[in-house]
A protein has these predicted regions:
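A metal-dependent hydrolase metal-coordination microenvironment
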Residues: 1-114, 118-132, 136-158, 169-171, ...
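C-terminal functional module detector
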Residues: 1-7, 163-167, 174-287
């Protein structure tokens, strides 16, 4: 990541009374502004929000969630579009996830796979899709209550093992605004605080997902190296089923290393702080 620029905290998946959320657009925006967020995208189902800026300076990216399929047998795909300059040419009768991705991109936005663990998406099916900008590795509203599958790390690893390394994003997917708001965010490293710079950084993959801690992952001389805010545990994930250096535990950890095995093709990292909050890097190709 670039050294210059600014770090900006954002949420790019949330709902209001315009679809299945329980608060108004105005209240949803206010909740995140009070929580200190720098940017958000309101992503109601099949209702595109507009780009803007609040009086307090929080950036509003345009957004929408396009969902298809009701059962795993049919295939459940929820795809979030962010930053579209025009309305994607899509109807609610659409059945193709690939066409949704294509139309989001054609409208100037980025397409994000939402909560793949919740949707029980298979890595093999998603590997056939093209044009995704990233996937949610953690989705707050998919946690208890009312759901039970918030974490998609296994999916990310299975997909990366097939050679598809999707950047990892964090999102609240807020509906109730009780337990599911301002929990898991995306931290974007942008050249400045502007709509254009945020979208540029997202497209470049200059971000990580977090509930609070910071994380940076590099590969140096046969090792994966993490730099982070003070942590209780650092975990390394890859396509090796066994690596005896993949976990570092202690107090106030700010750096950790994992020896890479000759056959590993990717690595990613997670940081856990003393409160149990996590930060998630994206997977990095090592060969």
């Amino acid at each position: 990541m670039r050294q210059e620029g600014v770090w900006l905290r954002g949420n790019m998946h949330m709902h209001t009374t315009r679809s299945d959320g329980r608060v108004s657009v105005e209240e949803a925006i206010a909740r995140y502004e009070r929580a200190g967020y720098d940017f958000i995208a309101v992503t109601d189902h099949w209702v595109r929000s507009e780009k803007g800026t609040t009086a307090g300076g929080m950036l509003l990216l345009s957004g929408c969630e396009y969902n298809i399929g009701d059962t795993v047998q049919q295939g459940v795909y929820h795809i979030v579009g962010v930053g579209m300059e025009t309305a994607p040419a899509l109807e609610r009768t659409e059945k193709s996830p690939q066409r949704i991705i294509d139309e989001i991109n054609a409208a100037g936005g980025v397409a994000i796979l939402a909560h793949p663990a919740w949707s029980l998406n298979s890595a093999e099916d998603v590997a056939r899709l093209t044009g995704l900008c990233g996937t949610e590795i953690y989705n707050t509203t998919s946690a208890v209550p009312p759901n039970v599958r918030p974490y998609s790390g296994l999916f990310v690893d299975q997909l990366a093992s097939l050679g598809v390394l999707l950047p990892c994003m964090g999102a609240d997917d807020a509906h109730r605004y009780v337990h599911d708001a301002a929990v898991c965010a995306i931290m974007v490293h942008a050249r400045e605080k502007s709509h254009e710079a945020v979208m540029e950084a997202i497209r470049a993959g200059d971000f990580y997902a977090t509930m609070g801690p910071s994380v940076s992952l590099t590969v140096e001389g046969g090792e994966a190296v993490v730099a982070c805010s003070p942590a209780a545990q650092v975990e390394f994930y890859s396509d090796a089923v066994w690596n005896d250096s993949r976990v570092t535990q202690g107090e106030g950890i700010t750096t950790a290393r994992c020896r890479l095995l000759p056959f590993e093709t990717f690595v990613r990292a997670e940081v856990v702080d003393s409160e149990g909050r996590r930060a998630f890097s994206s997977p990095v190709r090592v060969k």
